[in-house]
Regions:
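Short, charged, low-complexity loops and linkers
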Residues: 1-6, 29-39, 119, 152-160
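Acidic, low-complexity proline/glycine-rich segments
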Residues: 2-27, 167-171
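Active-site-proximal alpha-helical scaffolds that flank and shape metal-associated catalytic sites
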Residues: 11-12, 69-168
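Helix-loop segments that flank and shape redox-cofactor active sites
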Residues: 24-41, 52-72
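Conserved small/polar residues in nucleotide/adenosyl-binding loops
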Residues: 175-176
Length: 177
């Protein structure tokens, strides 16, 4: 299976942004294992808002010739994020969370792109989901150790129950780009 030229271009073109993201104060601290439970809880809450928007927009475009082929429900994160949010905030977690201003801008952009030029969602899909299947697994291990989490609780976001072989799944996904 050949990786598409577009997939290679995405990887190349997002490299600088990826490096810049890794060098933000929060991410660089996180990568060193310096993360507070409060900041991690907010990260999980922000992820919830982002992935809820992504999954709602991909559902709207499930019959789209490009997006319908790209998104696989095994990637969906919302249910796992809800489980994590119950762990961190309790059963009425919805009353305790709100997106940060930056997160809300990102969610607005996802919805705007979906409405105006849905094929641009491909870039968001690549950045979020493929990143979760790759570096996200490293972040899971760091969070587990830093926050002293046990038995996977609070880390369900990183679990992809419907994907047995992440590497093979990514390889197939890259051919759809």
């Amino acid at each position: 299976m050949a990786v598409s030229d577009f997939a290679l271009q995405l990887k190349t073109e997002t490299k600088k942004s990826h490096t810049a993201a890794e060098n933000t104060k929060f991410v660089s601290s996180f990568l060193r294992g310096v993360v507070s439970k409060d900041s991690y809880k907010q990260l999980v809450a922000n992820f919830y808002f982002v992935y809820r928007a992504m999954e709602e927009e991909f559902e709207k475009h499930k019959n789209h010739p490009v997006l319908g082929e790209l998104h696989n429900e095994a990637l969906n994160r919302v249910n796992n994020l809800e489980r994590d949010l119950r762990y961190y905030y309790g059963p009425i977690w919805r009353h305790h969370i709100k997106p940060t201003e930056q997160c809300q801008r990102y969610v607005n952009r996802i919805r705007e792109v979906s409405e105006d030029d849905p094929e641009l969602l491909v870039g968001h899909h690549y950045t979020r989901y493929m990143g979760d299947l790759s570096g996200g697994q490293i972040l899971k291990n760091i969070a587990e150790k830093s926050l002293n989490l046990r038995d996977g609780e609070g880390l369900w976001f990183y679990e992809f129950e419907g994907i047995e072989d992440k590497k093979a799944f990514k390889a197939v996904s890259y051919t759809h780009l």
